[in-house]
């Protein structure tokens, strides 16, 4: 048996499966897809015997690197600006990983393919491993970084923060709604095949440039598993394509999955890479250049376009619009400014941009200074307490944004905002596609066909609404973003740990916080129309040349 080929071993495993012919199995995870005509193959023939030794070696490398980082005093060299953003990133990323593990039973239940079930089971183990080594990385940062505050509350903070809940929405997309939509198209075909390129390849490169070689070790270990996950997703995609009835659903899901991944992943990873780095070499790639290489060329041209030969309509318009938003509409820079605006309710510190940063941004994104430079200068000016409020509550020509109901990223490209009354509530969307996702895609019927398994976008999706009318100091206290002395805030708009320069609860007490979405629903029709027009026309202090 020890010399048996993998092919024969894989065949033996599939023989252990069985399909009852005397009864219809109970459906645990529903799907509107049909697989009656589907081919049933697993091209990689994944089995545990070859899998576990390989993963053990990768784990040994990860934990060896962690030990080496401590012995080599990595934390004396790593940039504080970079590690502060890891408080947010490493609070979010284990959740999508463990959600992906939860998604695998959904796919196994929904896909009648004994060959691929073993590969999906292996993927489930992968995702648990990924989450585990990421949590261990976060713990190591917490134990060795100069300012552990924020790392120590990430599990709680991730769930109650205005940015963390965007990541939660992203991860919950793997396990909610139609089983194939969630566990295959959204997770595997788009998130893992496309956006792990910037997440697990481009971002580790930036980490290394900032003195952090632990994150590259961990995330390259993660990325090395993705080829198998991509194979699983592609196999199920081909099964679905075998039945013409699935084509409208596939085209719907590709549009939704692509756009939601772009809205969330590009917002987060783009910000971490562009605004978390101190490496401003002129030959260093911008996020836009990384995106062009890793997403547009590597995924769109190499993976998506060939699907057209199967008669599938690819969302070319959304790919081009995502690129347009990153390059021409400054999507990532708008997100970074929003995160910095909200610094009092963060659990990480955000470093101010310097002249070196300004010069680099202007080199990579011509016109950046005219749009964002003045605001960042004001951020520097208002960084310390005593004579001013936090920047969100000062007059710096910046209007706090509405929240997108679908992707939950604020409506930052203001001219693209869509407003509509849906399910008895006035909702704002960052784009036409996010509005379509809520109003058309996630509904019990699609193009005249019943789609009962899609579900709805529900819940408390507007973070600001949960805290409407509260005092800012009370919000921060309720969130738990206060240091051990009971008064100093964990978040700061600078990296100076001098107690005299750090904001406390007393510095923010008496500042009322309001929700734009609550205000929108309280307006009359005329007031609402005027407000929306003014919001969409607001350039937020941009200098017109």
UniProtKB/Swiss-Prot annotation:
One Pfam family in the UniProt entry: Phenol_Hydrox
GO molecular function, one term: metal ion binding
Entry-linked SUPFAM superfamilies: Ferritin-like
Enzyme class: oxidoreductase
UniProt EC number: 1.14.13.227
Keywords: Iron, Metal-binding, Monooxygenase, NAD, Oxidoreductase
Inducing stimuli: By propane and acetone.
Tagged with keyword Metal-binding: yes
Subunit structure, interactors included: The propane 2-monooxygenase multicomponent enzyme system is composed of an electron transfer component and a monooxygenase component interacting with the effector protein PrmD. The electron transfer component is composed of a reductase (PrmB), and the monooxygenase component is formed by a large subunit (PrmA) and a small subunit (PrmC). Probably requires the presence of the chaperonin-like protein PrmG to ensure a productive folding, resulting of a soluble PrmA, which leads to the active form of PrmABCD.
Name under which the protein is recorded: Propane 2-monooxygenase, hydroxylase component large subunit
Originating organism: Gordonia sp. (strain TY-5)
Source species taxonomy: Bacteria, Bacillati, Actinomycetota, Actinomycetes, Mycobacteriales
Gene: prmA
